Amino acid sequence: MNYKLASSPHQHVRRNTGQVMRMVIYALIPGILLQTWFFGFGVLVQIALAVITAVVTEATILEMRKRNFERAIKDYSAILTAILLAISIPPFAPWWVIVIGTFFAIAMVKQLYGGLGFNVFNPAMAAYVMLLVSFPVQMTQWLPAQSLTAHQPGLIDAIYAVFTGFSADGFSLAQLQGAADGHTMATPLDAIKTGLAQGLTYEEGLQSAIFDGSLGIGWWWVSTGYLLGGLYLIRAKIINWHIPGGMLAGAALCAGVMFLVDADRFASPLFHIFNGSLILGAFFIATDPVSASTTNKGRIIFGAAIGFWVYVIRTWGGYPDAIAFSVLIMNMAVPLIDYYTRPRTYGHTKRTKGEPK
């Protein structure tokens, strides 16, 4: 019997870019729903504004470049970037913040470098850093979980607040930010960082009303939602475990060592993993296939280094959370990491020391 030898590739992947991006968006849904439940409809308003801005910006630039914008938009990469940026900023940030940030992500970070597959930095995180540096007040107006607030804005209130700064009933963001017990510190990372700076111990800082044990009310639920989505992506083989595993392990190891050294001055590993955006960053942001490392060994190094920088900046830096800065730092190191972690080419032996190239 004669057998036909098929040409390569011998491993066939039926998913195209658009399908992969859609699956990542689907995996974000549990976390987005929980984030909306605990922190208000402003999350959905920001997502809507970001997606509209991303699509319009992408279509305009591609039209100017004489490219097929319909095919490019159908790959959903711009929409995914918009969603990641939208869920990273405060839900009630002014409308122009997300519009400027999304335009910057698509136009300056993605298209300026040549479009999908050519950007050096993660577009969503580059835009986040630009917004944080340019508009620090608007980017730090986080609200406590709605169960702690005296006023719980609905969808109409959220739309009013994003576009006018006031709810439909006339409450300002400062009034909405005030918790039922008068506590206005919005995020667990903010609360602990401020408490430690004021001389409180870690355990004393956890006595704030925004904590339930060592976990921020609402925040650990949101992190769990993104964790479930991330595990789905690994199971569906959309992403590998190397980057999220390395990132979580790197941050947890650093936190564990320092917590053992002085439990009064340093937060526990559990606190760092479930409070803030570490899980979101590990599964959905650092795993960007364009700006991340491409080898398995390199991915572990890349992820672990991001986890290290997250802990360092959170603990000793000027920003409570540090996912964006850490990802961008390691984006710059990707060429070096890939160079030294390239697997040996099949059929070639490893070059011995002193052997000419």
UniProtKB/Swiss-Prot annotation:
<dbReference type="GO" id="GO:0055085">
    <property type="term" value="P:transmembrane transport"/>
</dbReference>
<feature type="modified residue" description="FMN phosphoryl threonine">
    <location>
        <position position="187"/>
    </location>
</feature>
<keyword id="KW-0813">Transport</keyword>
<keyword id="KW-0472">Membrane</keyword>
<protein>
    <recommendedName>
        <fullName>Ion-translocating oxidoreductase complex subunit D</fullName>
        <ecNumber>7.-.-.-</ecNumber>
    </recommendedName>
</protein>
<dbReference type="InterPro" id="IPR004338">
    <property type="entry name" value="NqrB/RnfD"/>
</dbReference>
<feature type="transmembrane region" description="Helical">
    <location>
        <begin position="20"/>
        <end position="39"/>
    </location>
</feature>
<dbReference type="GO" id="GO:0022900">
    <property type="term" value="P:electron transport chain"/>
</dbReference>
<feature type="transmembrane region" description="Helical">
    <location>
        <begin position="154"/>
        <end position="174"/>
    </location>
</feature>
<keyword id="KW-1133">Transmembrane helix</keyword>
<dbReference type="InterPro" id="IPR011303">
    <property type="entry name" value="RnfD_bac"/>
</dbReference>
<feature type="transmembrane region" description="Helical">
    <location>
        <begin position="266"/>
        <end position="286"/>
    </location>
</feature>
<feature type="transmembrane region" description="Helical">
    <location>
        <begin position="214"/>
        <end position="234"/>
    </location>
</feature>
<keyword id="KW-0597">Phosphoprotein</keyword>
<dbReference type="GO" id="GO:0005886">
    <property type="term" value="C:plasma membrane"/>
</dbReference>
<keyword id="KW-1278">Translocase</keyword>
<keyword id="KW-1003">Cell membrane</keyword>
<feature type="transmembrane region" description="Helical">
    <location>
        <begin position="300"/>
        <end position="320"/>
    </location>
</feature>
<feature type="transmembrane region" description="Helical">
    <location>
        <begin position="115"/>
        <end position="135"/>
    </location>
</feature>
<comment type="subunit">
    <text>The complex is composed of six subunits: RnfA, RnfB, RnfC, RnfD, RnfE and RnfG.</text>
</comment>
<keyword id="KW-0249">Electron transport</keyword>
<comment type="function">
    <text>Part of a membrane-bound complex that couples electron transfer with translocation of ions across the membrane.</text>
</comment>
<keyword id="KW-0285">Flavoprotein</keyword>
<feature type="transmembrane region" description="Helical">
    <location>
        <begin position="321"/>
        <end position="341"/>
    </location>
</feature>
<keyword id="KW-0997">Cell inner membrane</keyword>
<keyword id="KW-0812">Transmembrane</keyword>
<comment type="similarity">
    <text>Belongs to the NqrB/RnfD family.</text>
</comment>
<keyword id="KW-0288">FMN</keyword>
<feature type="transmembrane region" description="Helical">
    <location>
        <begin position="241"/>
        <end position="261"/>
    </location>
</feature>
<dbReference type="Pfam" id="PF03116">
    <property type="entry name" value="NQR2_RnfD_RnfE"/>
</dbReference>
<feature type="transmembrane region" description="Helical">
    <location>
        <begin position="83"/>
        <end position="105"/>
    </location>
</feature>
